[in-house]
Amino acid sequence: MDPAAPGLACSILRLGLGLLLLCSWWYPGSAEPRAPPEKIAVIGAGIGGTSAAYYLRQKFGKDVKIDVFEKGKVGGRLATLNVQGQEFESGGSVIHPLNLHMKRFVKDLGLSAVQSPSGLVGVYNGETLVYEESSWFIINMIKLIWHYGFQSLRMHMWVEDILDKFMRIYRYQSHDYAFSSVEKLLHSLGGDDYLGLFNRSLLETLQKAGFSEKFLDEIITPVMRVNYGQTTNINGFVGAVSMAGTDPGLWAVKGGNKLVCSRLLQASRSNLVSGLVMSIEEKTRTKQTGNPSKVYEVVYQTGSETHSDFYDIVLVATPLNRKMSNINFLNFDPPIEEFHQHYEPLVTTLIKGELNSTVFSSRALNEFHLGTVLTTDNPDLFINSIGLVSPVEEDNNPQPKADTAHVWKIFSAAALTKEQILKLFVSYDYAVKQSWLAYPHYTPPEKCPSIILHDQLYYLNGIEFAASAMEMSAIAGYNAALLAYHRWNGNTHMIDQEDLYERLKTEL
């Protein structure tokens, strides 16, 4: 070997390094990362807002101050009601075994999962039980095939196909990819087929697939009524999410699903502000560096006092519905579009008493073995469903007994009158109710509100118009945190990327 070769190689290496350093000095793409924001506001402490705060902390680091505003209780629509010293779920109640964000939260936050009650189910049409489960699997299969052919199997396969594509979102988010609209997120999961589900009614989708009117009326509609208080006129995507709620293995968080929100808030090291946000306005402020910068002034009320503070980034994680969060967006140019879509009223009633089983069948209570009764779309029916429930601390399935009063949960569109309660129960010891604007009223074709309302102003709850569920809100919270992080740092290559599934499936 030429003895001069090592020296020549070193000279070339030094020259190359010098050129690289010179290039990095002037090349604009290699500028230092932008300094993190000083303050971030999250409005709403439900599962969407608290998961967003959790992921914002992970992305932006320990120094940013995060304020989470909540006018009510942490948890939002995840809540419990007390029945004679025991707590029962009154809001979002069950979690699917494939809801990976919720599973991760429970594991990482030191919580425990309990299996949801899985008693026998019947369907009531106002006159009789048109379908009734047996405790024997083979008998259930025979009943379903006898009444509906193989439509239940076809429905299972249809839902499985949609869920299989839906699972792609976890891979995208694990690689930090974000989406600027709900439509782009859905398209990334399943292409035009997913958007088709979103823009057509479940009824139209399933009729085209050859499902019978009898199957739709007696099996599908009752599931929509218990989960979303609506019929098969909802969009096909939320219909699939609703049908997934009939899968085995559903679970909940021991102590109440709302514990996930309070633990996420703690883990994010956010500051909880108990107040009502009244307005958001873009302002220009001079920071410590002496340079003017755009910020958002959040005006909020605590008790009788009005306060304000300034934030670099704001995430709105509460429905922009005048009855739920009357936030005014002031002096934006162009004005921020108002989204006041209708939310469906729902009343949850918990009653401890002895069920009048003869309302649903001719059998006495000691011969009535159903744990849940769903209903068809009959205007004469005043309930969507009724079912036995367990306290949030217990891990067992309640079984009806003739000699013992049990706690039953009833979903209805309006508050039950005393006469209606006495029709459902032979006697009762205690009744408590909670009224909700629970989920959007679905009227496909849907138009989801924008996620990006302004430069650094984001809205999470638009995803509810695709489907409203705990896991959907957690996905929206993660997506909004990633979107805010990438837009703050100019990482446009991490937003709205096409063909992610094909690109990522080849990675190890």
UniProtKB/Swiss-Prot annotation:
GO terms for molecular function: prenylcysteine oxidase activity. Residues 1-31 form the signal peptide. It holds the Pfam family Prenylcys_lyase. Keywords: FAD, Flavoprotein, Glycoprotein, Lysosome, Oxidoreductase, Signal. One of its GO terms (cellular component) is lysosome. Glycans are attached at N199, N291, N356. GO terms for biological process: prenylated protein catabolic process; prenylcysteine catabolic process. InterPro entries: FAD/NAD-bd_sf (IPR036188), Prenylcys_lyase (IPR010795), Prenylcysteine_Oxase1 (IPR017046). Its cofactor is FAD. The keyword Glycoprotein applies. The keyword Flavoprotein applies. It catalyses: an S-polyprenyl-L-cysteine + O2 + H2O = a polyprenal + L-cysteine + H2O2; S-(2E,6E)-farnesyl-L-cysteine + O2 + H2O = (2E,6E)-farnesal + L-cysteine + H2O2; [(2E,6E,10E)-geranylgeranyl]-L-cysteine + O2 + H2O = (2E,6E,10E)-geranylgeranial + L-cysteine + H2O2. Its main location: other. Its EC number is 1.8.3.5. Prenylcysteine oxidase that cleaves the thioether bond of prenyl-L-cysteines, such as farnesylcysteine and geranylgeranylcysteine. Only active against free prenylcysteines and not prenylcysteine residues within prenylated proteins or peptides. Involved in the final step in the degradation of prenylated proteins, by degrading prenylcysteines after the protein has been degraded. Belongs to the prenylcysteine oxidase family. This is Prenylcysteine oxidase 1. It comes from Bos taurus (Bovine). The lineage of its organism: Eukaryota, Metazoa, Chordata, Craniata, Vertebrata. The gene is PCYOX1.
